[in-house]
Swiss-Prot record:
The lineage of its organism: Eukaryota, Viridiplantae, Streptophyta, Embryophyta, Tracheophyta. It holds the Pfam family Pkinase. Residues 10-26 have a biased composition (Polar residues). This is Shaggy-related protein kinase delta. It catalyses: L-seryl-[protein] + ATP = O-phospho-L-seryl-[protein] + ADP + H(+); L-threonyl-[protein] + ATP = O-phospho-L-threonyl-[protein] + ADP + H(+). GO terms for molecular function: ATP binding; protein serine kinase activity; protein serine/threonine kinase activity. Residues 82-366 form the Protein kinase domain. The keyword Acetylation does not apply. Residues 42-53 have a biased composition (Acidic residues). The modification Phosphotyrosine is found at residue 242. The gene is ASK4. The active site is at 207 (proton acceptor). ATP binds at residues 88-96, 111. Belongs to the protein kinase superfamily. CMGC Ser/Thr protein kinase family. GSK-3 subfamily. Residues 1-61 are annotated as: Disordered.
């Protein structure tokens, strides 16, 4: 929901880490210009840089928006009024502004999207079916009309004051790295949210990035937001490949694959985790081709088999052979071996070799979170991490459930207590 990170971030890391391979990398960059990799077209970029839609759509501070909600249990419709406070995010989709409910005093976020009459709004349909502790909650929705007869869809969402992006930048400004406990907390909650989206809803988010991860700064509960790019992926049906913000885009998307899977979200999660550990984006590409160059500089050249798994059309392309960069040199500090192992599971060129979201949740990197005595640095309890509903655990092998839900959490979870 925020604007993108600047492309310059992280370039010093790239230059510092690749002095000895600069000639190979230059060759790689030149050669790969011939690949005709599908990046965003000029039309796409124009759509991304449209002027913010603010005037006359009810987001001015103090503007009152009144709507009616269906009554519950046969009761009459209820009138609800929101007072706009200030804009918290803008983009090609429209805008998000903070508002307060006059009747209850509750603070909400309202996402206002220009409704194209030619298309049904997929985001609304998706959000109406979501219910999870790590997914932002849709309270209700309504349409509004301007003097020009333009129709806007308004999604009234729970308000979460911070994002992972702003939280990470606050550490960068102080020249500090984010404490490891927060890296674990945020990455785990992304994975748990994705496990729900992927397994329970068959949904791929397609734009996981720090700006789309909301965080409560007091509890450190994380919620995935912005389902404007999300889609239920159907095997055999093609999808657009130029989705997902560049730094977090899986290599198969850069290669133009159209029959990708939810594994693209797993790659993006690895990019977020690495960014939190590093203090800046791991793969700061300046174009589609340059993004692939950045990935190869760290992971090395993909094998022919790996390229085939990403997009069979490129198996004959001759890539210069570049060796992988050791992780301890990438991060220039000692990382726990569990962190390195999890990153390796996220960053597989072959989508089918990446770990699933559930497999990530049971990874030893998160064992500290399963300790019954684990606390936030200020001594407060951790946010709810193990309050699984039956739907979340459906189809998961019993031995995986045992690793997923620690014993102390089973006693607190009524469903788990009945089945343990």
């Amino acid at each position: 929901m925020e604007s993108h990170l600047g492309n310059g971030v992280g370039s010093s890391r790239s230059a510092k880490n690749t002095k000895n391979t600069s000639s190979s990398v230059d060759w790689l960059s030149r050669d790969m210009l011939e690949m005709k990799i599908r990046d965003k077209t000029e039309a796409d970029e124009e759509r991304d840089s449209e002027p913010d839609i603010i005037d006359g759509v009810g987001a001015e501070p103090g503007h009152v928006i009144t709507t009616t909600l269906p009554g519950r249990n046969g009761q009459s419709r209820q009138t609800v009024s929101y007072i706009a406070e200030h804009v918290v995010g803008t983009g090609s989709f429209g805008m998000v502004f903070q508002a307060k409910c006059r009747e209850t005093g509750e603070v909400v976020a309202i996402k206002k999207v220009l409704q194209d009459k030619r298309y049904k709004n997929r985001e609304l349909q998706i959000m109406q079916m979501l219910d999870h502790p790590n997914v932002v909650c849709l309270k209700h929705s309504f349409y509004s009309r301007t003097e020009n007869e333009e129709v806007y869809l308004n999604l009234v969402l729970e308000f979460v004051p911070e994002t992972v992006n702003r939280t990470a930048r606050s550490y960068s400004r102080m020249n500090q790295l984010m404490p490891l406990i927060y890296v674990k907390l945020y990455t785990y909650q992304i994975c748990r949210g994705l496990a729900y989206l992927h397994n329970c809803c068959g949904l791929c988010h397609r734009d996981i990035k720090p700006q789309n991860l909301l965080v409560n700064p007091h509890t450190h509960q994380l919620k995935i937001c912005d389902f404007g790019s999300a889609k239920v992926l159907v095997k055999g049906e093609p999808n657009i490949s130029y989705i997902c913000s560049r730094y977090y885009r899986a290599p198969e998307l850069i290669f133009g694959a159209t029959e990708y899977t939810t594994a693209i979200d797993i790659w993006s999660t690895g990019c977020v985790m690495a960014e939190l550990l590093l203090g800046q984006p791991l793969f700061p590409g300046e174009s589609g081709v340059d993004q692939l160059v950045e990935i190869i500089k760290v992971l090395g050249t993909p094998t022919r088999e790996e390229i085939k798994c990403m997009n069979p059309n490129y198996t004959e392309f001759k890539f210069p052979q570049i060796k992988p960069h050791p992780w301890h040199k990438v991060f220039q500090k000692r990382l726990p071996p569990e962190a390195v192992d999890l990153l390796c599971r996220f960053f597989q060129y072959s989508p089918n070799l990446r770990c699933t979201a559930v497999e990530a949740c049971i990874h030893p990197f998160f064992d500290e979170l399963r300790d019954p005595n684990a606390r936030l640095p200020n001594g407060r309890p951790l946010p709810p991490l193990f309050n699984f509903k039956p739907q979340e655990l459906s189809g998961i092998p019993p031995e995986t459930v045992d690793r997923l839900v620690p014993e102390h959490a089973r006693k607190q979870n009524h469903f788990m207590a009945l089945h343990s």
